[in-house]
């Protein structure tokens, strides 16, 4: 198969869907088959993907664009580029595809927040993405979601034929593991000015992640005499000022640390240094950070919503969304009970081994084959 991959949505600092783009392309390129991959990407794409030199990938480097102008380019210029490469199929990795294409197409939907929680997106994104996603759902030969939860949401919200939409869970990179190297840990601690004992959150600082709930529960933990600090890892998204303001309002500026964006190379060590990982999100299409935390041997607390029970299973604590009391109680339990901590560490590592990028690529390739056999 000659497969086109639209990776032009890959941002300079990948998180979430950006990591999916990187890891899927790496796994597809490493697979032992005769497929030819043609990757459409902006200028930083090859460096971010960091494929081995011997990997046979045809690069189509396009002009760097802002997210808004990229979407216009996708509709107006990408079809002509695709036609010139003579690919059998184009896989669009981030919600949308060109309205006109000279080949079969597959589109990945990461979540359905544009329909379920539109208030969690900027006005510009609310204006564009719902209609573009509906059009992609109609026009694509097949759709991929990253969890069964998102698949069911898409079927219900977009009236999609269930036979047209497939689930390919995300994976966890082998670099996310227990690390015993004290020198490396000291280096990362100094680099990000991390405290000795801390509760960790990782993700964009934005409304969907529901960080005020965590900050309020943590305030109660401080009032209870905890010595653990709270470390919030991730780039500032829209409305991040609300979180900073709440930290100041609750007089937690000396107890809460903001690191900003942390590179993928450093993340495994940051996880390894944490005593507990908390992910209080309102909705997730998958929730990759909880899987990475479990692989690194960190107990996990998250919300009983959308894909998270599907990913975590019995390997962590799930609480109701927006329940500060439940989050506080769960944090007290895990931090205060070493036997329980060790149990969650063991179960989490076992659970994380069920997910791999090789499996993601294998299932994705099966979708390609089915599309080309029936189109």
Task: Write out the residue ranges for each language-model feature.
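Carbohydrate transferase catalytic cores enriched for Leloir-type hexosyltransferases
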Residues: 1-375
């Amino acid at each position: 198969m000659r497969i086109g991959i639209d990776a032009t949505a890959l941002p300079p600092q990948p998180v979430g869907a950006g990591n999916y783009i990187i890891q899927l392309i790496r796994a597809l390129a490493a697979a032992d088959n005769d497929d030819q991959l043609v990757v459409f990407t902006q200028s930083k794409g090859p460096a971010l993907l960091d494929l081995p030199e011997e990997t046979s990938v045809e690069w189509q480097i396009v002009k760097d664009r802002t997210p808004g102008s990229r979407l216009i380019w996708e509709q107006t210029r990408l079809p002509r580029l695709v036609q010139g490469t003579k690919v059998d199929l184009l896989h669009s990795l981030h919600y949308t595809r060109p309205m006109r294409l000279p080949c079969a197409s597959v589109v990945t939907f990461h979540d359905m927040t544009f329909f379920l929680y539109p208030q969690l997106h900027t006005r510009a994104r609310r204006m564009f993405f719902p209609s573009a996603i509906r059009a992609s759902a109609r026009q694509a030969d097949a759709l991929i979601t990253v969890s069964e939860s998102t698949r069911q949401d898409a079927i219900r919200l977009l009236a999609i034929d269930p036979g047209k939409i497939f689930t390919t869970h995300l994976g966890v990179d082998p670099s996310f593991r227990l690390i015993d190297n004290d020198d490396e840990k000291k280096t990362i601690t100094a680099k990000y000015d991390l405290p000795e004992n801390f509760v960790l959150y990782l993700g964009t600082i934005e409304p969907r992640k529901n960080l005020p709930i965590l900050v309020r529960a943590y305030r109660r933990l401080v009032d209870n005499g905890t010595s653990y600090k709270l470390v919030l890892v991730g780039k500032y998204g829209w409305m991040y000022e609300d979180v900073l303001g709440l930290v100041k309002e609750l007089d937690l500026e000396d107890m809460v640390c903001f690191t900003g964006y942390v590179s993928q190379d450093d993340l495994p060590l940051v996880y390894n240094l944490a005593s507990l990982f908390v992910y209080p999100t309102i909705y997730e299409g998958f929730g990759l950070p909880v899987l990475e935390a479990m692989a690194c041997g960190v107990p996990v607390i998250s919300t009983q919503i959308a894909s998270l029970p599907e990913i975590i299973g019995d390997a962590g604590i799930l609480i109701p969304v927006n329940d500060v009391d439940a989050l506080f109680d769960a944090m007290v339990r895990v931090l205060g009970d070493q036997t329980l901590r060790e149990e969650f560490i063991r179960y989490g590592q076992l659970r994380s081994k069920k997910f791999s990028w090789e499996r993601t690529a294998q299932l994705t390739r099966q979708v390609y084959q089915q599309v080309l056999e029936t189109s």
